[in-house]
A protein has these predicted regions:
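Residues lining hydrophobic/aromatic ligand-binding pockets adjacent to catalytic sites
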Residues: 1-136
Length: 136
């Protein structure tokens, strides 16, 4: 399992975990991980901050789910929403484009409950590393 956003991930095993996937989206959706509309719009309108959003998302969504079942169900999938990710020079996610994204809350929740690290999908991971190629 990995996470990403619709703009950069175009593979076949993407799963939308947002309320509004792209209009042309024909891939899978996983509504159980979508933020409640009221919570989504409160954050979008700056009525709540990131900390309050995370608390409520955990209370209203994640607390009702079994992390083991979620992981087993979505194993091998890429969880998709809209926010772009920002990486440090080592390839670690610093935050999303506006500093916040619920897919990273899900990643953290899976780590806290199962010890599983769910990384942000990196297109460079898909490049085959052929060690037999000559350098010259």
């Amino acid at each position: 399992m990995k996470t990403s956003n619709f703009k950069i991930y175009k593979g076949d095993n993407g799963v939308a975990i947002c309320i509004y996937p792209p209009r042309d989206w024909s891939g899978a959706r996983f509504p159980a991980l979508e933020p409640p509309r009221k919570l989504f719009f409160a954050r979008k309108a700056d009525q709540i901050n990131d900390e309050e959003y995370e608390k409520r998302y955990r209370d209203e969504v994640l607390s009702k789910l079994d992390p083991k079942i979620i992981y087993e169900t979505l194993r091998g999938q890429v969880l998709l929403c809209w926010e772009p990710a920002i990486f440090d020079d080592r390839g670690n996610v610093i935050n999303s484009g506006n500093g916040f994204c619920h897919r990273h809350i899900i990643s953290q929740w899976l780590f806290e409950n199962l010890g599983i690290i769910v990384k942000e999908w990196d297109p460079l991971d898909e490049i085959p590393k052929d060690k037999s190629m000559p350098l010259f």
